[in-house]
Design a protein with these regions (language model features):
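Generic structural signal of hydrophobic/aromatic residues within well-ordered alpha-helices
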Residues: 48-60, 69-80, 196, 218, ...
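Central/C-terminal regulatory/activation regions of fungal transcription factors
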Residues: 53-70, 115, 158-336, 345-372
Length: 466
């Protein structure tokens, strides 16, 4: 460790790196080995698949409770390919993986025709997906939901979003409804549900979309002892709470004093629940306070997935305090009460302090999360291949939390410049065009309308096993 740790803050727990961390840290950072896409005796399709699976799928890590990301996908893809299955669900998955892998690799290498092949297979995948969606038995398969997951990655890798809205949110809602509780009973189904749920919450909370799926019953079945799943449970409560104020016919004041007071109390309980979430975490999940070789105070983590989860936690806390501030302002405008005005002023001060701390902690985490330093604060050497030291999936999952830090209006000019810089670098080094788009986002048209890439007709809309 390069310096002494700062005292722990009152809003979350942090630690200093231990001797054990010195010997075992940095497992998520990539070593400078020869990338699979540079092996000369393989086709571009083979190189693309190797690159995509290496960068966007994570094998479960026992140290953090078996968490991975799409770790089942390589074997599922291999089954669909090797068995030469001709059903729409299997064909759509094969084509979606091929298309997304080629698009991901095309952003790393300059080879004529790779992008053309990627978009051609993307079109074929959409066609096969539509065929699967038209057949209830095919629509409910893991392969169909996995296709939707992969196509949503294609959308962000290629930069095909119109505004900030995803074209696949309606599809995620419909298939989540169709698959029901049974999807939580096996590892692949739970993995895909978590991915889809986080995307839907981003759409509804951060981008102020209108959900058509009531997923509360599914979320209630998640494991509250699991850090990510317990945070998802709290996020569901946040969505339930804000759905009422945001649906108010005219303004918050129209809800009346009693309702406003009730919403404020609910916000307080949820903020307390979020804080308590940090107190239940085991040491392996806690941020580590250390100092870089230049004397900068930073936060690092024992596992990269922990950094991602903390990034989403901080956004939820900022979001809750922003909502609470709006509710207090509406209440003060209806009540000429010195007591209420004092309480509102006190909350505004406390909420601003906590929110600024969340922004600061998010920015202090950036050097580690984007591969500039290791867990002990030491600088990482540059990659020989010009790639990020962090897997593309981890960089991808950090984009929306950092975008919210940019858009909430609390970041300093220096913090804003730093976030835009790492996003722009992610766009070029990891080849994720969404990062480039978010880095230059000017705050307009957050929810522009999107054309439907596929239709979700009666078989998917009306059949449900929930």
């Amino acid at each position: 460790m390069n310096g002494k740790a700062n005292p722990c803050s009152s809003s979350s727990r942090k630690q200093q790196p231990s001797n054990h961390d010195v010997s075992s840290g940095g497992k998520d950072l990539q070593v400078a080995t020869l990338p699979a896409y540079q092996i000369s005796d393989s086709t571009w399709e083979e190189r693309a698949i190797c690159y995509f699976f290496d960068q966007f799928t994570i094998v479960e890590c026992n140290a953090v409770g078996g968490m991975g990301h799409l770790g089942f996908l390589p074997s599922l893809y291999a089954d669909c390919r090797d068995q030469n299955l001709g059903n729409p669900a299997s064909l759509s998955l094969r084509l979606a993986v091929d298309a997304t892998a080629l698009m991901a690799l095309s952003n790393r290498v300059n080879v004529p025709g790779v992008v053309t092949q990627a978009r051609y297979r993307f079109g074929l995948a959409l066609r096969r997906l539509q065929e699967a969606l038209d057949l209830p038995a095919e629509a409910a398969k893991d392969e169909t939901f996995a296709t939707l997951v992969i196509l949503s990655l294609f959308e962000d890798i290629s930069g095909d979003r119109h505004g900030l809205t995803s074209a696949h949110t309606v599809g995620f809602e419909a298939l989540t409804r169709l698959r029901g509780e049974s999807q939580l009973g096996h590892a692949a189904g739970l993995d895909m549900f978590k991915y889809a749920y986080v995307r839907m919450q981003i759409e509804f909370l951060l981008l102020k979309g209108k959900p058509s799926l009531d997923s509360d019953r599914l979320v209630e079945r998640l494991d509250s002892a699991d850090p990510l799943q317990s945070l998802m449970i709290i996020a569901s409560k946040v969505r339930q709470l804000i759905s009422e104020p945001t649906s108010a016919s005219d303004s918050l004041q129209s809800a009346g004093i009693t309702k406003l007071a009730s919403w404020i109390d609910s916000c307080r309980r949820l903020d307390s629940e979020l804080f308590q979430w940090t107190q239940t975490l085991s040491d392996i999940w806690l941020p580590l306070e250390t100092r870089t070789h230049t004397g900068e105070d930073v936060l690092t983590y024992r596992e990269m997935i922990a950094a991602v989860i903390w990034a989403h936690y901080r956004v939820l806390r900022i979001f809750i305090h922003s909502v609470m501030a709006d509710l207090f302002r509406a209440l003060v405008s209806l009540l000429d009460s010195p007591g209420i005005q004092h309480e509102a002023s006190q909350h505004e001060a406390d909420g601003l302090r906590i929110s600024l701390e969340m922004v600061s902690d998010s920015c202090r985490s950036v050097p580690f999360c984007f591969g500039e330093i290791d867990m002990l604060g030491n600088p990482m050497p540059p990659s020989e291949q010009g790639m990020s030291r962090v897997r593309a999936f981890y960089l991808y999952t950090m984009l929306w939390p950092l975008w919210y830090i940019l858009s909430c209006g609390l970041a300093t000019p220096e913090q804003t410049q730093m976030i835009r810089g790492v996003m722009a670098r992610t766009g070029s080094e990891a080849g994720i065009k969404l990062a480039t788009m978010l880095a230059t986002y000017d705050g307009r048209d957050a929810m522009s309308s999107m054309p439907q890439l596929y239709s979700l007709e009666r078989p998917v809309r009306e059949v449900s096993v929930i």
